[in-house]
Amino acid sequence: MDYEFLRDITGVVKVRMSMDHEAIGHWFNEEVKDNLALLDEVEQAARTVKGSERSWQRAGHEYTLWLDGEEVMIRANQLEFSGDEIEEGMSYYDEESLSLCGVEDFLQVVAAYREFMQQR
């Protein structure tokens, strides 16, 4: 999972992610922005569910983050649909609306994001 942090001309940090992980970048850009307390909440949740059967989720304005002890899923809220809406044999996937990655990989991106934010 490759990523890049940039600042636009106004100083706002933007995250770009590799293919198949675009929704993670969108989550940072739309939900986190400068809200490092949200990252604290996610990191705490990751510690809480680690090694258990539990999961945790945080719905935002545009994206929802879901995690368990092994995996993080970020999906666009517009992807609300039930399994019955998908034809048999078909799967719905929009790479900019849904991303999955391991918890450890995700936490590495969070740490790198924090570090980049401190380089103002």
Curated annotation (Swiss-Prot):
Leader sequence segment: none
- One of this protein's Pfam families, by short name? UPF0231
Q: Which domain of life is it from?
A: Bacteria
Entry's InterPro entries?
UPF0231
Entry's NCBIfam families?
PRK05248.1-1, PRK05248.1-3
By sequence similarity, the record places it as follows:
Belongs to the UPF0231 family.
Q: What is this protein called?
A: UPF0231 protein KPK_4613
